From Swiss-Prot:
Keywords: Aminoacyl-tRNA synthetase, ATP-binding, Cytoplasm, Ligase, Nucleotide-binding, Protein biosynthesis. It catalyses: tRNA(Arg) + L-arginine + ATP = L-arginyl-tRNA(Arg) + AMP + diphosphate. Pfam families: DALR_1 (PF05746), tRNA-synt_1d (PF00750). This is Arginine--tRNA ligase. One of its GO terms (cellular component) is cytoplasm. Its EC number is 6.1.1.19. It comes from the Archaea. Coiled coil: none annotated. The keyword Hydrolase does not apply. SMART domains: DALR_1. Belongs to the class-I aminoacyl-tRNA synthetase family. InterPro entries: Arg-tRNA-ligase (IPR001278), ArgRS_core (IPR035684), DALR_anticod-bd (IPR008909), Rossmann-like_a/b/a_fold (IPR014729), tRNAsynth_Ia_anticodon-bd (IPR009080). The keyword Signal does not apply.
Amino acid sequence: MDPLKPPREEFEKFVAEVAYAIGIGEVPEIERSKRFGYFSAKFHKYRVDAGKLKETVDSLKSRQFKYLTSISVDGLYLNVDLAVEKVAELTFRAVAEMGDKYGFTDECKIGSFLVEHTSANPIHPLHIGHGRNAILGDSLVRLLRFCGNVVQSHFYVDDCGVQVMYAAIGYNVVKKYVDEVLKRTKPDVVIGAIYSAVNAIAEINRLKKELEKEKDDEKRREIINEIDSWVSVLKRLIDTEGEVINKLVEVLGQRNIVEEAAELNKRYETGDPEVKKIVREVVELVLKGQRETLARLGIELDSWDYESDIAVWSGEATRVVSELRRRWPQYIDDRGGAVVFRADKFVEDFKLWDVLDLPKFIPPVTLTRSDGTTLYVTRDVAYALWQARRGFDKVIRVISTEQTHEQAHVRIILYALGYEDVAKKLIHYAYEMVNLPGMKMSARRGQYISLDEILDEAVERSADLVKEKNPEIAGIIAERVGVGSVRYAFLSTSPRKPIEFKWETVLNMRQNSGPFLQYTYVRAYSILEKAQEIDLKKVAIPKEILPEERELILKVAEWPSVVREATRALRPDYVAEFLDGLALIFNSYYEKAPVLKTEEPVRSFRLALVNSVKTVLAAGFYILGIPTLTKM
C-alpha cells in the first residue's frame, strides 16, 4: 500500500486533461518537483506556449480535488502541492494495516534471485573488504525478501588452487600443535597465520636460490631487501604463534613449497583421497571461523557451494575447455601447454560490448595451467552454469571491481558456449574497496585488518557511548550498536564508490551513522512505551500542523517508493540515505514538539506520527541488518 499513489494518480489524471485540452497526444511524465510544490509535469518537449498552458490550467483547476492543492504553472512546469492532512490519513491507515511490512508494494516484487556473496578464500579470516561484500550481499537478500521475492543466498567456497594448498601444506606439518592453539584462538586466525608463514618461507627459499645465481651487486641488494621483508613477516607471526611458526620454519625451510603446492593442487583436482582429507580439514576450520564472524553481523547463508564438487570433480570445468576448443578452435591458443582463449578477438568479431555489458578493454584469458589444472575463470564458468540450473530469474554475484575483467570473461565464455541467456542474467554486482587510513593490506604477508578486529573495536568504542546510562546491560547494547555502526558504514555509500573508514564518522551520534539511527529509534520507542495504545485508523488530523510534521508525514509516505526504487536498482544505500534523512527530521521535531503532554486530538496525531516513524525505521533496520534497541 503506497499512500502517495492516490495523490499521484489524481495529478496524472489532471495532467492528462491539460494535455488533451492543449492538443498534446501523450501525457507528460510526472516527477518529484525540484521547483514548486510536490509533483511536477514538464511540458518542454511539446513546444507548448507557456501562456496557453497557464490559461488552460487556470480554466481546469477550479474544481474540487481530494489530494491536490496549490496547482500552479511556472514557465512550462505544471506544479502541484499535496493536501498533507489527506496524505496523513492515507499514511496512518497504511501503517496500521501493513505494520512492519509497510513499504512493500506489488511493484517491488520483481522475480527470483540467487545472490552469491562473501565467497572469501578459505585460508584466512574475513577482512574489512570481505565485510563490505558480506554486508552488501546480505542487505540485497534482505531488501529483495522484504519485497516478497524468492531469494537464496550462496557462498562459493574456493577450495581449489595453489593458495589453499599452501595452507594445507603448513597445516599438515603443525597439525598436532594446532589443537592446543585452537583452544584460545579462532580457527580462521590460526590457519591465516599458517598460510602467511608458508608464503613467507616459500618466498625466502625462492629468493635465496635467486641470490645464489645473481652476480649483479645492485640486483643482489634488491633480493636481500626482499628477503629481509619476508623475514620480518615471519618474525611478526612468531610473536603471536611462536611454536607453530617455528615448527613451520624448521620443517619447510629447505623444501620447494611452490612445486609441492602445484603437485598437491593437481592431486586435489584429480580427487586423491589423502589430499582431499587434509585440504577439506583446513577449509572447514577456516569456514567455521568465518561463519562465527558472519553470525555476529546477523548474516546467514542458505548454501555453501564447494568449487571442487561443482566445477572440478564433476568434470564441468574440463568440459568447458573441451567445448570451447570444439566450437571455436580459431580462438584457442596453446602457450607452453597452457590453454588460452582469445576473448579479445571473440568480442571484437561478434561486437559483444553492449550485448554483455563489457568493459572496453578485454584481454585474452588463460583457461588451464601447463600441467592441465584449471584456473579460476574456467571453474567460475562451471559454477555459473550450476547457478543457472537452480532456476532463478537472475543470478547476482557480489564481487569487487578488481574482478571486472574476470567476470567479463565468464560472461564471454558462457556466450561462446551457447549460453547467451545465462550470460545475460548473470549480474556482476561490483563494489569498490574499503580504505583504512595508513593501512596497506596483503593477505600473503598476513597484513590485514580482520572483520572481527573492526567489530571488536566498534563494540569497545560503542561501550563508551552507552555505559553511563545503562551500565548493567552495556555489553549487550554495545555489541548491537557496534554491529549497527559497521553495517551502516558499509551500506551508506554507493557500492561503486570507495569507503574511507573513519571512526569519527562511523560512530557519529548526530547524523549519518548506525548509532544515530538506533538512538532515533530508541527515542520513538520510548515515547510510545509511555503512551496508551492508539487506534491509527481513527486518528483525527489537526487543522494546523507544524512544518516538521508536514515534512515527517510526506517523508513517511515516501517510504514505499524508496523501497521500490532501491529494489529495482539493487541499491541498499538508497534505504540508508532515506533513513538518515527521516531521522534528522524526526530528531528536530522531537526537540520542538511535546507529544505525551499535549492535549487531544493533537496528542493522538503526534503519537500516530511517532509510531509511523518507528515503523519505517524498523523496516529499514531489517533491510540494512541494523539491530534494533529499546534502550541506549
